Amino acid sequence: MGALINNLLYLRYPTRHCTYKLAKFSTGCGLWQDVRMASGPGLPDSLVLEIFLHLPHKAVLSAGFTCRQWFAVSRDEFLWKELLYNYYCIPRSVPRHPAAVSWYREFKRLYDCIPCVEVQTLKEHHDQVLHLAFSHRGHRFSSCSKDCTVKLWDTERSDGTISLVHSSSMRQFNWGYTQFSQFNVDDTLLLVSGVYLGPHQSSSGEIAVISLENYTLLSRVRNKPYDVFGCWLNETHLISGNLHWIGNMTSCSVLWLNKAFQDIESENVNVVKRLFKIQNINASTIRTVMVAHCRRHDSPDLLLDYEAQSKAQAQQTQQHQPLFFDLGNTDSEEEEDEDKEDKEDEEDEERGEKRVSAHLPSFNPSGIQHVIHGRQSIAARERELETKVARLMGSRRTKAPDPNLVSPSAHGEGEDKTYLLFTTGSLTYSPHQIGIKRIMPDQMTTCGPVLGEERSTDEFFDSLDHVIDIHGHIIGMGLSPDHRYLYVNSRAWPAGCVISDPMSPPPIAEEIDLHVIDLKSLREERRSLRAHRAFTPNDECFFIFLDVSRDFVASGAEDKHGYIWDRHYNICLARLKHDDVVNSVAFSPADQELLLSASDDSTIKVWRSPRMVRLAEAPQRPPRARKLLSSLLGRRSANLNGKP
C-alpha cells in the first residue's frame, strides 16, 4: 500500500523539490506508522483525496489524525460515498438512504451499528429452541423450545446482561413442545402456541394465554393444524384455526376469534366468534396467520429494485400481474359429512384396486411395475376428479368478494386497514401462496352471532381478497415495524415446473430467497435477497422465523448461521454463527442494535453492535468537579438571598 501511494505521488508530482517519506503501512491494524514531510508545502487536498480513495476505510480514519488538513479530507462526502459503494458492492443506481444526513454517517451506521458481536449465550433450555418474541416495550422476551417450556427473560438489568424471569412447562396439558409465542399490544398477556399430543390428533395444536402479572393460565384454545400458530388481533382477542376435511384432497379452514379469558359476568356474552370459512383444494391448508394493522402508510416508500422499477415506470409494463391476482372466483365446495366422504373414497379406492388385480399379469418385474403404475394412475385420476368437483361446487358456494375491501392504497389515503395474512396453496399441499383477507371493524369483537353474519347457501365459503404466488415453498414470514412490508422466506421451485400431482410438489432449492411484499400496493417487489441456505427436502422442511427492524431484516438458516441485511441497500451485513440450525431471530423493538438468535444447539445468543459494546466497556467518567468561579458565584447568590 505504501509503495502504491509513493508511486502515485511521484507520477503526480515528479519535479517537485519536496520529498515525502511514507513509512511502513500496516494493513493488519490499519494504522499509519510514520508520515512526515521532509520539506516544501503541504500536499494539496485533491492529492490527499486521491490517496485516500485507494485506502481501506480504517486506514482513512487513522490517517485523518495526522493533521488538520488530512482530518478534513478524511471526512469528505465524496470520499465516503465512494468507500461505501465500493466496500459493500452497492449498485450505483441505488441512492443514499433518504434518512441519512451524510455519507460518512451512513457508512458508520452500516459498519458500526449492526448487532454482530456475541455478548452472551443463554443455555437454560435443554432442547432445540424454536422461537423468540420481544415485548412491544422491549423490556422482556419469550422463548419456546422442544423441551416443552416457555421462558420469560428480562433485558433491563443494570449490568446490561439478560436473565431468566419465569419458566412454564406445558407438559401438564399433554403438549409435545412449544413452538411460537407473542405478546399482546400492552404487554400484559402472552400467547403461547404448541403441538398437542392428544389421541388421533397428530396435526392438532393448542394455544394458551398466560397473564404476565402473576403468570397464571387464563385460557386454552384448540388450534388445528398446529402450524396455524395463532396471533393477537387486539389487546384482548386472538385468532386461532380449525380444519375440517371434506374429502381426501379437499378441506375447509375455519378461522376463529377468541377472547383471551373466560367472561364470567354474563353467560350471554360470547367468548368465540367465527371469522372466515375458506375452502382448501389439493391438500393445501391455511397456516401461519398474522395480522397487519396498516395505518395509512405514512412511512416513505422502501425502494428495493431501482432499475426494474424505473423500467417499469417508463414502459408501464405489467410484470407484476402474475404475482397479484384476485381469487374472487375461487372454486370451493360445499362442506359435507367428513366420515361419510372418507368411507366412500376408501370404497372407491378398493374397487379400483380390485379392477386392477382382475387384469393382473404373470408375476414378473415388468408386470409388478405395470400394476404399481396402474394404481398410481388411478389414485392420480381420483385426486384430479376430486379437485374438479371441488372447483365446480365451490364456484356456486363461495361468497363473492367486495373489490373495494382490499385494493392498492392511493397516495395520501387516510383509511386504516387491518389485514389477515396467511400462507396457503392451490396447486399442492406445500404452502406457496400468501393469502390476504381484510378484517372489518365489526368483526373485531365477539359480539353478535357465534357463527358470524347470516349467509345463504350460495355463500358457504368466504373468498380470498387477494393472493400473491411466491412460486416456491414458504418457510417464514415477518412484518416490518410499521406493518407496511411483509418479508417472506421461501425456497424456490425450478423455473417453468408443472405440478401434475398435488401430493408430489416440485423439488425445492437449497438457497432461501427473501421476498418483500408492499402491503400498500399489494405487490411483491421484484428484487429478492439470497444469502442463506437450507437443505431439508419438501416433506421435512420446517419453519425459519425472521424479524424486521427499522433499518434491518434478519433471518435464520439451516447452514448454522443467522443473517442480517440492510432493508434499503439489499446487502448482507453480518453472519451470526451457531453450532446448528438457526430457527429464529428477534430484534429488540426498543433498540435495533440488540438481536437474539435461537438454534437447534439449545442456546439463545445475544448480539450487540460494536458501538454498543464499546460504550458498555468504556470506563465511566468521574463526576466533573465544580469550577472555582461557579462556586464563588453560587455563594454570592446565596448571600444576596439572605442565606448564611
Residue ranges of predicted features:
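Terminal intrinsically disordered, low-complexity extensions flanking WD-repeat/beta-propeller proteins
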Residues: 219, 225-230, 243-475, 498-515, ...
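Loop/turn segments within WD40 beta-propeller blades
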Residues: 132-139, 183-186, 231-236, 469, ...
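Canonical WD40 repeat/beta-propeller blade segments in eukaryotic WD-repeat proteins
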Residues: 127-133, 172-182, 226-231, 473-477, ...
